[in-house]
């Protein structure tokens, strides 16, 4: 098995982070790209074929016309108090109609998006992930780390939050 992580922007203007990891979880390569074609070019043949788990930080399956998906409601019920909730996604939003960007990539690469399909050596699966709730849980945090750009956040404060997260990885 090997792994791909995609911090997928909902549109093709903002940057998307892409990382490829080997079977032991070591980083092989990473990049920041914008378009689906750039993602395909970066990943190339490493993201095709069996034995691959692709973790995508973006909605993959969006059947609802309005409001939130049940998974978003569930995440928000448990993680809102940690400032680690999920944004709502629905087909009324242009980014998800007719199809979410993550689903388009999964189809392009042949990744199975069915959440009932277990990862295996003879298949490649794409799973939707929620990094902020994962960080809160894995590192036993009182709130999500504020390492992204935002109102009132300085470069120094964001750097400190990111270093805190990275230091926590040694303990996880």
Residue positions per predicted region:
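RNase H-like (RuvC/DEDD) metal-dependent nuclease/polynucleotide-processing core
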Residues: 1-4, 8-172
């Amino acid at each position: 098995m090997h792994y791909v992580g995609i911090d997928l922007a909902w549109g093709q203007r903002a940057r998307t982070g892409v990382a490829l990891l080997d079977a032991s979880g070591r980083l092989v390569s990473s990049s920041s790209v914008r378009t689906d074609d750039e993602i395909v070019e970066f990943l190339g043949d490493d993201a095709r074929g069996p034995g691959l788990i692709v973790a995508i930080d973006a909605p993959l399956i969006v059947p609802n016309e309005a409001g939130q998906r049940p998974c978003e409601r569930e995440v928000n019920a448990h993680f809102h108090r940690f400032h680690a909730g999920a944004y709502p996604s629905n087909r009324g939003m242009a980014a998800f109609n007719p199809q979410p960007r993550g689903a388009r990539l999964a189809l392009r690469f042949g990744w199975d998006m069915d959440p009932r399909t277990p990862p295996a050596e003879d298949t490649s699966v794409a799973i939707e992930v929620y990094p902020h709730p994962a960080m809160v849980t894995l590192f036993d945090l009182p709130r999500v780390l504020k390492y992204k750009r935002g109102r009132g956040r300085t470069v120094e404060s964001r750097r400190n939050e990111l270093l805190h997260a990275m230091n926590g990885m040694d303990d996880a």
